Amino acid sequence: MTDMPTLDAIRQAPKALLHDHLDGGLRPETVLDIAGQVGYDGLPSTDAGELASWFRTQSHSGSLERYLEPFSHTVAVMQTPEALYRVAYECVEDLAADAVVYAEIRFAPELHINQGLTFDEIVDAVLAGFAAGERACAGAGCPIKVRLLVTAMRHAAMSREIAELAIRFRDKGVVGFDIAGAEAGYPPSRHLDAFEYMRDNNARFTIHAGEAFGLPSIHEAIAFCGADRLGHGVRIVDDIEVGPDGDVKLGRLAAILRDKRIPLELCPSSNVQTGAVASIAEHPFDLLARSRFRVTVNTDNRLMSDTSMSQEMYRLVETFGYGWSDIQRFTINAMKSAFIAFDERLEIIDEVIKPRFAVLIG
């Protein structure tokens, strides 16, 4: 096989996904179906194709705040145990169909309480959907392991409660904690209590930082909060200088991020939609990869960005000329950075990822 991977070939490659929002990855048909069942009449279209196009167009807004607006529709149809179970189940199916072998999916339980569900009931429904999806995919010959991150909204005041939820479910499929939402005006340090609670319980967490806001957000996430990973982190490029001769000079923050091997959950297509970068070609992914940061490739929101892991990888291949060895490195980076036990990570790398890439690389 040639060293320039095609999209069809990439679809066969094993993938590891760390940054994907459950409420940003619904099938358009499912949104319509559940909306009809629960009587939600706020959708902009009753045609699946038109609805998918609307989500994509609305999300290509140029700002994170506007990018988040269409989520009101997906969240509206995820307010019952049955709906949460179905969305979780179909998420597993869709990822497995794209050859994802490991995924950490995140969502904010506090957005799903409109019909009186408790946080525990909400998480139970999602985990049950994941488990059933895993069983079905294993039976179909495309095994996948999916784990959950529970997210607190950074503008709200529930982060400690959500962190406690993460610990209650830590042995049932929840592997970590996150904060998300608009960055400007809502720094990570507002949620120190939640992060300290996670550290006190020897638990892992990631923080959305450096997506719409700059270096101060990243600095707080690392220095004050102790983040294990950074959600996006794309603005770390503001602390990197590239000279006329191509020499790369890292600032203090960029250097410690690289040297401590803090993973970056980069989401190229989403970053273009939110205006974090102007285009894939101008995305700092390649600069960060060449500078040996621990970069990972992610979808963020598959419905909103009309994307998949294969498409994200292929866009990088098209833009930066990556080959199979690069894709394998990004995949192993993600698997090394997962919030499951070391032996589980190693097993997936050695017994699934490397053997399947060996066939592709030839």
From Swiss-Prot:
Domain of life: Bacteria
Keywords: Hydrolase, Metal-binding, Nucleotide metabolism, Zinc
Cofactor note: Binds 1 zinc ion per subunit.
GO molecular function annotations of the record: 2'-deoxyadenosine deaminase activity; adenosine deaminase activity; zinc ion binding
Active site positions: 211
Gene Ontology BP annotations: adenosine catabolic process; hypoxanthine salvage; inosine biosynthetic process; nucleotide metabolic process; purine ribonucleoside monophosphate biosynthetic process
Family matches, as InterPro entries: A_deaminase, A_deaminase_dom, Ado/ade_deaminase, Metal_Hydrolase
EC number(s) on file: 3.5.4.4
Residues annotated as binding substrate: 21, 23, 181
A GO CC annotation given for this chain: cytosol
Gene3D superfamilies: Metal-dependent hydrolases (3.20.20.140)
Cofactor: Zn(2+)
Keyword hit for DNA-binding: no
HAMAP family named in the record: A_deaminase (MF_00540)
Family as reported in the entry's similarity comment: Belongs to the metallo-dependent hydrolases superfamily. Adenosine and AMP deaminases family. Adenosine deaminase subfamily.
Its biological purpose: Catalyzes the hydrolytic deamination of adenosine and 2-deoxyadenosine.
Annotated protein name in UniProt: Adenosine deaminase
Organism for this UniProt entry: Mycobacterium marinum (strain ATCC BAA-535 / M)
